[in-house]
Structure formats: structure tokens, C-alpha cells
């Protein structure tokens, strides 16, 4: 065993590729017009797609219903691994008003104009006056601050705050200003509500359709997450909330957000506008590291294989970006336009799959395990102690898999935290837990559909035998291999306290 990550990498053999089934990280794909049919969804799943994402910034309820229906039909057509469904909220945002005649108005450098919250200009914007739909902008902004319009295509400096409704600004570059463009206020704390009326309606639509996770846009504080939890209510209590970190406030308040959220998405699009671009990759590494230590799943997203929207092959920089996200510790990576509107959606998923496979085998797993174990706060809870023991036993025994008999997915998540170099086979009767387990690195869900029997120990042995049989049939393990098992002493969630070593 190499004693450092450096020696591990120096001895790394890039030609050694694990079997196709054993990709540890998960791939999320946004479904759009190019991919919203059962045949294409089956192809995407065969290429490696694990989670379907619906972007609620676009599309009607009828359209999103068709995505859900087609995703579920694809599971009937092709069994494969369980498919999870995620709803991505539009989130609270700031936008410009409507220009006169819906025209684009050219803006030269050093051009002075007015930004106003006066509703009289809502549909009467031009190159002299532009309506901004954030009523409190004059209260939070100050002279010298920067305002970005249209994802930073246009930049303005605030000259003065003239009254409760009016800002005077100066353009810092040339461009065009037009209707309904996004507005960013980098370095300014805003007090937008966590949820718009549309977001609330969208989340209720997701609850009704039993989606597995909510990707919550523009999360700034822990209270934002709690507000979403209230909207989910009792009916949606099992839906995972993934907080999208997209602004400086979210970064500043990350520790409190991490305590209450189920997971995190590093959403680098808006984040790269809100904070200086050279800082984004460092913030990405920091947030992923914090999630890894807290055993919270983390997704890396935005422009990962962007050029594959129109080209059959990505740039080398994009491939490196995906690989480095995996090396940073991301549990999942996400595709947006590449699968929603791109010309090569299946190829994009396949490229991401192969890139993740290669990156995963470059990780120095023993060193990572020792580091994570040394940083865990003591004393650990019983379930986490069992997770550490299982991973340690897998190394000592040269085991080929860790089988976790789970009710809620907690035990599998904690084993995943310690990043074993063998697959974690999660056996559960809980279909929802199986599907959102795609959020956890290295977890492969197996849905055990036989009814529970009264004799607990016999029920445990039945599930274990079935899981081993399935894993052998899939080629994950072979007859005679050592495997480590994690199980509970009684029924219910949170009772895992037994680690065993058995032969397949």
C-alpha cells in the first residue's frame, strides 16, 4: 500500500479500467425536448444516467408531467439501476423589465442611465431607464457597487442612490440591454424570499408526483431550507432537499446551511458571476470537502461538458473539469444543456461515465479513509462506528464488496462517507431510499421486494443471500469472495450495529 497520495498517483496504471457497472459517482441529466421520450431515456440510462432533472425555470406542468411519466415508463422498458427524479426550482431571482417594443437597446461604455423599481416603467424600458423587479435594491446597494445584467454580459457601476426607487448607474462595457434579463448583485446581501409563489406551486407539484429530490435554487441561509421543508410538509418528508449554492451569501452561510440540508449542489453558473471567476474552483473544493466531512452528498454542476451541446467531442479542459470534480470528492456530476437541448445527449452521458470511471481509480482510497477516520468527531454514533469498522474490515480482508441491509439509507450513506475502494451494495425494501441513494458515492441500490417475515434473523439471512446472488449474477463479485456486511439487530431505521465477514 502506498503511504501517500503522491506515491499512489506516481504508480497509477491508467490502463486498468474497472467493469462498467462499478462507476461510483452518479450522473444527473437535465431532460429537454431532445431527450423527453422513452427510447432516448433508455439509451441515456444504458449510457450511465442515474438521475433525471427537470428544470422548472422553463416548461409547463404538462411538459414536466410528461418527463416524469416517460422516466417511469423507461424503468418498465429497461430495468437496469433504479432511476431517481429531481425537481430544480426556478428560485427567487432579479430581472429587468420589458423594453419598449421588446427591442434590444445598444449600450456603449460609460453610458449613464437610471435603474428604477417604479412600476410605471415595468413595460417601458429603454437605454435611458430600466425597470428592476427587486423592490429593495435601493436599500441594499451602495455607490461603487457593481450590477451585472444578462449573466454578466453587461456590467454597471452604481453612481448614486437617488431615492427609494431610483439608482443612477454607469456602464463599464458595451453590450445590449433587453427584456427580462437576469440581474446579479455581487458582494451585496439581498433579502429576497426563499420561495416565490411559483416555487411553492412547483414544489407541491413535485410532492404530488413523488419526486425524490428538490434542487433548491439560490439558497442563502439555513432558514431558506427550513422554509422549503415546511412547504414539503408531511407528505413530502422523504424528499431530499439539495441546496444550490449560487452566491456569496450562500458561501458565507454555508456551515449553517449544511447543518439543515440533505445535500448540496455547487452551482457554478451564477456562482461564477457573484464571486470572482478565479475563486470558483477553490470554493468548489472547499464546499465539497465540507460536505465529505459532514457525510452530506454533493453535486458539481454547470458547463461540465458544455461544448458537447453542439460537438460530438468535449474540450480537454471540460474532461479535466469533470475528472477534477470527482477527485475533489463530488458524489454526483450534472449535465444541463448537453442533455436538455444538445445534439449528442447519449454521447455526453457516455463521455461523463468514462471520465468518472478513470478519475475514480486515480483516488488514493486507503489514504483518504485514514484521513476521514482521523477527522471524525469522537465519540461517533453507533451506526457511524459500524460504518468505519466495515470499511476497515474490507481493507483488512481484501473484501470485494460491502453489503448494507438498510431501511432508510442512513447506514449506506455513512459507509459511503469513508470512501471504500469496493462497491457498497445497499439492500432495501424502501424504493424511495434506493432511488435517492444515487446521491451517495459508491452506493449501488438493490430493491428487495419480498415481504418481511416474523423471524428477524431469518429475514436478514434471506436478504443477504439474495443480494450476494444478484451481485454474483451481475459480475460485481465472484463465488468465494470475502464480503463485509452491515446490519441491524432489530427492525427499523438507525439500528445498524453488526458487522460480519462472510464468503460469497
Curated annotation (Swiss-Prot):
Its main location: cytoplasm. It catalyses: pyruvate + ATP = phosphoenolpyruvate + ADP + H(+). Signal peptide: none annotated. The record marks 244 as: Transition state stabilizer. CDD domains: Pyruvate_Kinase. Pathway: Carbohydrate degradation; glycolysis; pyruvate from D-glyceraldehyde 3-phosphate: step 5/5. ATP binds at residues 55-58, 95, 181. It comes from the Eukaryota. Homotetramer. Has antigenic properties. This is Pyruvate kinase.
